[in-house]
Amino acid sequence: MFRRKLTALDYHNPAGFNCKDETEFRNFIVWLEDQKIRHYKIEDRGNLRNIHSSDWPKFFEKYLRDVNCPFKIQDRQEAIDWLLGLAVRLEYGDNAEKYKDLVPDNSKTADNATKNAEPLINLDVNNPDFKAGVMALANLLQIQRHDDYLVMLKAIRILVQERLTQDAVAKANQTKEGLPVALDKHILGFDTGDAVLNEAAQILRLLHIEELRELQTKINEAIVAVQAIIADPKTDHRLGKVGR
C-alpha cells in the first residue's frame, strides 16, 4: 500500500512494512520524524521516541496536530499515507537541484495524457493516496465531508472553478458600476413627514431588494451545483444502469 513512497524515501523494508504491528508502526513514525520530516527539534523528540510508553498514542496525536495532518490517530492508514506524502515533498525540497532537470519519457507522457482524458473514470477511489488527497483538499477548502470521496472531489472542482481560478478572482475583484435610479419613480408606501428621511428609506429599500436578488442568485447556483453532483452516474453509483 505504501511501497512506492517508502521506496522513494529509502525505507529499509518497503515491501514488508506492516502498519498494524504496533511496535513496527511506532518505530516507523520515529524514523520518519528523525530522518525525513524533522518537524521537532532533536531535544523535543523524546516523547515520540519513547515507543514503549503508555502515553505514546497521546504524543503521536499531538504530533499529527503539530504537522497539520488532517487525519486523526484512529485513521492510521490515511495518517501514514499523509505523513509519507509530506516526507516525499520535503525530501524533494531538500534535493530540488538533483531532480529539477529530469525529463519525463515521451511514451509515458503520451500514455498519461490518454489516461487523464477522463480523470474521474480512471481514478481508483479505494486508493489511500486518493482518499488522503481529497480529504486534505476538503479540509483546506472547508468542504463538508461525504462518504463518497468522488462526490467530495467533484465539489472541490466546482469550488475551484467558480471561486479560485484567475478569471473567477478577477471577476470578483471587479468594481460594479451601478446605473442611476430615479427615486421618485419608486413609491415608498408610507410618509415619514420628512423629505430627507423618505429619500433615505427609498434608498434602503432598493439596496435590500438588490441584496435579496443576489441571495436568490447564489441559492440558484448552489441548487444547480448540488444537482450536478447527485445526478451524475459517475459520482452516484445508484444512478448507474446497464441496459434498459
From Swiss-Prot:
Its main location: nucleus. The keyword Hydrolase does not apply. It is found in: Nucleus; Cytoplasm, Cytosol; Cytoplasm, Perinuclear region; Cytoplasm, Cytoskeleton, Microtubule organizing center, Centrosome. The modification N6-acetyllysine is found at K20, K62, K98. InterPro entries: RTRAF. GO terms for biological process: negative regulation of protein kinase activity; positive regulation of transcription by RNA polymerase II; RNA transport; tRNA splicing, via endonucleolytic cleavage and ligation. The keyword Nucleus applies. Widely expressed. Expressed at high level in heart and skeletal muscle. Expressed at intermediate level in liver, pancreas, fetal brain and fetal lung. Weakly expressed in adult brain, adult lung, placenta, fetal liver and fetal kidney. Overexpressed in many brain tumors. Coiled coil: none annotated. Keywords: Acetylation, Cytoplasm, Cytoskeleton, Host-virus interaction, Nucleus, RNA-binding, Transcription, Transcription regulation. GO terms for cellular component: centrosome; cytoplasm; cytosol; mitotic spindle; nucleoplasm; nucleus; perinuclear region of cytoplasm; tRNA-splicing ligase complex. GO terms for molecular function: identical protein binding; RNA binding; RNA polymerase II complex binding. It comes from the Eukaryota. PANTHER family: CLE. Homodimer. Interacts with FAM98A (via N- and C-terminus). Interacts with NIN; which may prevent phosphorylation of NIN. Interacts with POLR2A. Component of a tRNA-splicing ligase complex with FAM98B, DDX1 and RTCB. This is RNA transcription, translation and transport factor protein.
